[in-house]
């Protein structure tokens, strides 16, 4: 490897191996499983990720003829096969999307039901929502939440079954208006707190040191024109905007659309005015990549 370049040489085929991951990375685990499924011999992956999406992938691959054992555990065994065949498989519900809407309901003191969802996949999130004051009711493949006065709670992201890093930013938006002082610790990714400055622009009181955010809850946030820098921070800004009594415009929805389908239409069911608008107005915010504009229309969300 030379700086940002990777030099590789193609081999005629892959062979099984014993691999131990330094950290239980979801992407690395998925990639290794898919490669090992068609490799010659046995592959053993230790310290593998245990996220539900890993288990779902393994179930589909096994339907296609793969031989994968113990998915969902820290040690996964794969016996390579010569070929795979087609199958029909229903992907599990998106737990991160479901969690985002539950957090949005808590932030706006709303009552909603999210379905279909697998409640066990969100146990860590549901526990924190209950701890922060919301009432949670689980019935089969649905979760109902009734938002209440928000209390400050501490969270620390962790691999599954811990609190998911993908819901750290939305939950921080919730904690900005909680009563009391909370602490959010990010242990999975570096530089995943770029939403802190944006939330502070809206009136929150967050102090960031390394990977730990200390939050003093405020009574309300103010509406702003802001630009989401990535998928989860965009969702967090919109949740924060929903709690404001004034109008907010959130841009950079090309990030949001990667992970959420019809996001604003679904959020409108919370009883809040939110809609997608088209504007040719230039954005002056320094954190926006102006190369994306190219004199094209820019999409934003209006929440009030």
PLM feature segments, named:
Residues 1-304:
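Structural preference for solvent-exposed beta-strand-turn elements
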């Amino acid at each position: 490897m030379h700086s940002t370049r990777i030099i590789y040489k193609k081999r005629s085929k892959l062979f099984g191996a014993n691999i131990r991951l330094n950290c239980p990375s979801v992407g690395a685990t998925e990639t290794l499983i898919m490669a090992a499924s068609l490799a010659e011999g046995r592959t053993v992956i230790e310290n593998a990720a245990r996220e539900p999406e890993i288990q779902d992938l393994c179930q589909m691959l096994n339907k296609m003829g793969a031989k994968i054992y113990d998915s969902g555990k820290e040690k996964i065994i794969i016996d390579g096969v010569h070929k795979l065949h087609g199958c029909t498989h229903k992907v599990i519900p998106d737990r991160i999307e479901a969690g985002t809407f539950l957090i949005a309901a808590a932030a706006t003191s709303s009552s909603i039901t999210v379905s279909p969802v697998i409640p066990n996949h969100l146990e860590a999130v549901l526990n924190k929502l209950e701890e922060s004051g919301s009432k949670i009711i689980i019935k089969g493949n649905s979760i109902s939440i009734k938002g209440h006065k928000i209390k400050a709670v501490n969270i620390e992201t962790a691999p599954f079954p811990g609190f998911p890093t993908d819901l750290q930013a939305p939950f921080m938006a919730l904690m900005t208006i909680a009563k009391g002082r909370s602490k959010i610790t990010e242990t999975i990714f570096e530089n995943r707190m770029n939403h802190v400055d944006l939330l502070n622009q809206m009136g929150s009181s967050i102090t960031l040191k390394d990977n730990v955010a200390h939050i003093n809850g405020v009574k309300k946030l103010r509406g702003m024109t802001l630009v989401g820098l990535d998928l989860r921070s965009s969702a967090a800004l919109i949740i924060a905007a929903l709690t404001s009594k004034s109008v907010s415009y959130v841009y950079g929805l090309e990030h949001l659309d990667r992970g959420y389908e019809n996001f604003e239409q679904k959020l409108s069911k919370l009883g809040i005015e939110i809609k997608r608008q088209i504007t040719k107005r230039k954005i002056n915010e320094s954190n926006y990549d102006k190369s994306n504009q190219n004199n094209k229309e820019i999409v934003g969300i209006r929440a009030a």
